[in-house]
Regions:
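Glycine-enriched, solvent-exposed interface loops adjoining structured elements
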Residues: 1-200
Length: 200
């Protein structure tokens, strides 16, 4: 349920960027979605070996925002792998230390740098919410007792405004699991009503 809501942020952001926004501080949908996504924005320095850096060490990696050379504070431009040959063969577009570029191979998370290859790069990215883990201990009578002090305790990470949506998603999933058509119908109806209200 948490991942469904999280991924919907990006689809909604894409949709709302297509329509004119407004200047109202607390009512612009693009601003609200960017605020929700900002909870998951992180930066991390990773080593470069040869001309390649790998994102596989970033366990919660979801989407790449930008790459920066930490020594010069210059941002790398993202280009496709098919464009790199065109860039390298063009005197005006050839990557340089002042205008470096990178290509990304998503399946294996490899980033290849062109123009300038530092020892490390600063990766600005959007991370995934961690999997919820409500810890417990088994007490006498084989009963589970919530353990708030466990080091692996992890709650939902969504924006507080998503509480209703999260409950409805969980109810929908519970309706499927319990095979309760009434519960499923109520949750689906509320979800549709909320979605319609957000789109207006």
């Amino acid at each position: 349920a948490q991942m469904d809501i999280f991924e919907q942020y990006f689809y909604d952001l894409n949709q709302f960027r297509r329509v004119p926004g407004n200047d109202t501080v607390h009512a612009d949908m693009v601003d609200m979605l960017e605020e929700k996504i900002s909870m998951f924005e992180f930066s991390r320095e990773i080593p470069v070996i040869g001309d390649t850096a790998t994102l596989s060490d970033i366990g919660d990696f979801y989407r790449l925002s930008s790459i920066v050379d930490p020594e010069t504070n210059v941002s790398y431009e993202s280009i496709s792998r098919k464009e790199i040959t065109l860039f390298q063969n063009s005197p005006l577009a050839n990557p340089t230390a002042r205008r470096p570029v990178y290509t990304m191979d998503l399946p294996n998370g490899r980033i290849r740098l062109f123009g300038r290859v530092p020892d490390d790069i600063l990766v600005n990215y959007i991370g995934m919410p961690r999997r919820v883990n409500w810890t417990y201990v088994v007490v006498s009578g084989a009963k589970a007792l919530y353990n708030a002090n466990a080091p692996d305790l992890w709650h939902f990470q969504l924006h507080p405004s998503e509480e209703t949506e999260l409950v409805l998603k969980i109810l929908t999933l519970a309706g499927f699991t319990l095979k309760d058509p009434n519960l499923l119908q109520i949750a689906a109806g509320e979800d549709a009503k909320n979605t319609q209200q957000e789109k207006q």
